[in-house]
């Protein structure tokens, strides 16, 4: 891992400051999870809380790298979707998807900061590239470092648990929920 890396989190997240309005109002998805106004920001916030716990429990990770991965893993959604309310996919979103778009955004920022040949940039790019975990789920690469596995598991947990939590709050005690899209339309008790 990159424990003790010199590059700190503030050097990695300049990208967010370039799209602040979009990042904080866009949904995280169109239908699967956090598909509401400011869902992307809330998804990121939830993931940061989970990352804190992962770092407490599992030793050997670079906290700055994991936090930066959480903050930037879905940055491409701000160009993949048309807007914060009732979004559609942009042409770029349809053709490339948020992972590739996010990698492009990260590459531009890294080149502007002259850090595009650093290990930190390469490993952060790996986290963005691999956060869906498996090729069949849209990741161009599968996780290869501890922080990438952690990011994938954190993202997966939040994307599954948030819809369960939202649905259970709407379900009467002793009844089954409506089918949950992100759980292959399973209902929960």
Language-model regions, residue ranges each:
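Short, conserved glycine- and acidic-residue-centered signature motifs
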Residues: 1, 40, 95, 99
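Single conserved hydrophobic/aromatic residue that forms the stacking wall/gate
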Residues: 1-4, 8-9
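Charge/polar-rich, low-complexity and marginally structured segments
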Residues: 10-16
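Internal, conserved structured core segments that host functional sites
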Residues: 18-22
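Active-site flanking loop/helix segments enriched in acidic
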Residues: 23-42, 86-90
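Divalent metal-dependent catalytic cores for phosphoryl transfer on phosphate-bearing substrates
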Residues: 32, 56-171
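Internal active-site segments that recognize and position negatively charged phosphoryl groups
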Residues: 43-62
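Prokaryote-biased recognition of long, low-complexity C-terminal linker/tail segments
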Residues: 170-189
């Amino acid at each position: 891992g990159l424990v003790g890396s010199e590059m700190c989190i503030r050097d990695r997240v300049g990208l967010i400051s370039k799209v602040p309005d979009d990042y904080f109002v866009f949904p995280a998805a169109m239908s699967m999870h956090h598909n509401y106004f400011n869902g992307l920001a809330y998804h990121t916030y939830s993931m940061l809380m989970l990352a804190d716990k992962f770092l407490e429990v599992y030793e050997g990770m670079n906290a700055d790298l994991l936090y930066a991965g959480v903050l930037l893993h879905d940055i491409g959604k701000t160009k993949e979707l048309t807007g914060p309310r009732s979004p559609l996919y942009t042409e770029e979103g349809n053709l490339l998807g948020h992972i590739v778009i996010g990698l492009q955004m990260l590459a531009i920022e890294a080149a502007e900061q002259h850090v595009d040949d650093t290990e930190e940039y390469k490993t952060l790019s790996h986290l963005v590239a691999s956060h869906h975990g498996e090729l069949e789920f849209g990741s161009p690469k599968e996780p290869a470092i501890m922080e990438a596995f952690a990011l994938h598991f954190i993202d997966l947990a939040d994307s599954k648990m948030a819809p369960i939590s939202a649905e259970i709050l709407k379900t009467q005690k002793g009844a089954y929920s409506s089918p949950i899209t992100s759980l292959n339309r399973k209902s929960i008790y």
